[in-house]
């Protein structure tokens, strides 16, 4: 059975299915949304970005994080290619760990208006101190199962 593509409120501007240049900055990046075909069902979507990078705003040195984004969608889903491009736009962005993590969560929440969203940013040590940053919206819907984010506490090589 063949399905035709669904129209979205932004369908003309979707990045999916076409060549797109890497956005120069997070503000320039577009996060696309597509209709949720299961909008009447409470469930969880997880995106994991184990190789997220940004730049220290003071030294310009690269910072690395393992991001886990969980959300209970409402009417919209995040289109994953656009999310990949958005996250990649941080590669040349100077921002503190806390700001990068919370900004990503807020931006996604603003674009898709999920029932619930949380982001965990597990940053690798710089100066010997790992920084973990967590942010979420509201309360989780009752019947949604949320597994552990699966990122172990940083233990170094010991």
Curated annotation (Swiss-Prot):
Q: What class of enzyme is it?
A: oxidoreductase
Q: Does the keyword Ribosomal protein apply?
A: no
Task: Describe which pathway this protein belongs to, using the record's wording.
Answer: tRNA modification; tRNA-queuosine biosynthesis
InterPro entries under this entry? Answer: GTP-CH-I_C/QueF, NADPH_dep_7-cyano-7-deazaG_red, QueF, QueF_type1
Taken from the UniProt entry, a GO cellular component term is: cytoplasm
A GO molecular function assigned to this protein is: preQ1 synthase activity
Q: Which PANTHER family match?
A: NADPH-DEPENDENT 7-CYANO-7-DEAZAGUANINE REDUCTASE
Protein name per its UniProtKB record: NADPH-dependent 7-cyano-7-deazaguanine reductase
Q: Which organism is it from?
A: Rhodopseudomonas palustris (strain HaA2)
Gene it is expressed from:
queF
């Amino acid at each position: 059975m063949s399905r035709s593509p669904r129209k979205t409120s932004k369908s003309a501007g979707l990045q999916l299915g076409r060549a797109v240049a890497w956005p120069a900055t997070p503000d320039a990046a577009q996060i696309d949304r597509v209709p949720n075909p299961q909008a009447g069902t409470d469930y969880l979507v997880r995106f994991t970005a184990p190789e997220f990078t940004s730049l220290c705003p003071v030294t310009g040195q690269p910072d690395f994080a393992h991001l886990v984004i969980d959300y209970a969608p409402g009417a919209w889903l995040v289109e994953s290619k656009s999310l990949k491009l958005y996250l990649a736009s941080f590669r040349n962005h100077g921002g503190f760990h806390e700001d990068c993590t919370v900004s990503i969560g807020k931006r996604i929440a603003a674009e898709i208006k999920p029932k619930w969203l949380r982001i965990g940013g597990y940053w690798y040590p710089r100066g010997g101190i790992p920084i973990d940053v967590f942010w979420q919206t509201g309360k989780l819907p009752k019947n949604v199962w949320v597994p552990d984010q699966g990122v172990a506490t940083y233990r170094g090589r010991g």
